[in-house]
Amino acid sequence: MASGKSTMASAKPTTCKEAIRRWEEENQQNAAAATEVILSFQWPPIEKMDNALATLINCEKLSLSTNMIEKIAGIGTLKNLKILSLGRNLIKGFAGLEPLGDTLEELWISYNCIEKMKGIQAMRNLHVLYISNNLVREWNEFARLQELVNLRDLVFVGNPLYESLEVEQWRLEVARRLSSLEKLDGEPIIRTEENPIQLVKTDSPSHDLLQEPV
């Protein structure tokens, strides 16, 4: 048993370069030519995003979910990237995403350690944001989302701010603040001239139903 623990403790994190090599072997494909690359569930987990990711020049969807990444890095040159999946890591903020502000359309970053929303306003083209089960607790942090004029689909369930309100009150507050939003926590928001905000009646959303795919 002791030797097993020692082996785990001494195992080095998987590098992005190694994860890409594994992906190429499994898929019999050159990663630089691929439009979708999945580097999720690495063992030992990836701890650092680095410049090896810059080789994924044609990538439109990149997944690094379920690792132990703390900071976003190494993807600033991926101008074709439209969907980035970083769920189930240890990420605390949005620094590192700024160069993708005009091109990234979907960010899946649920189950991380994000408390402050600083930097999200740089993602001008974002249509979809899955940020459930993080640590956001203040409306003044949430307010940064008001600058994302293209945001249509938001999943925010599981944050302390969400937990502090009844579901119906939460949905009314968000719909009022984000006038372009069409879908919140998996349920549509319907607006008409007579009634600017109509909310589909729903029970408290299931956290499992709102988990984004890999």
Protein language model regions, located:
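Alpha-helix boundary recognition
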Residues: 54, 76, 121, 146, ...
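Extended, charged alpha-helical interaction scaffolds
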Residues: 107-162, 171
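Canonical leucine-rich repeat
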Residues: 46-49, 72-75, 94-100, 117-120, ...
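Short, mixed-charge, low-aromatic patches
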Residues: 7, 97-99, 128-134
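The feature captures the LRR N-terminal capping module
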Residues: 1-68, 80-92, 99-106, 152-214
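Hydrophobic aliphatic residue packing
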Residues: 69-72, 91, 114-117, 136, ...
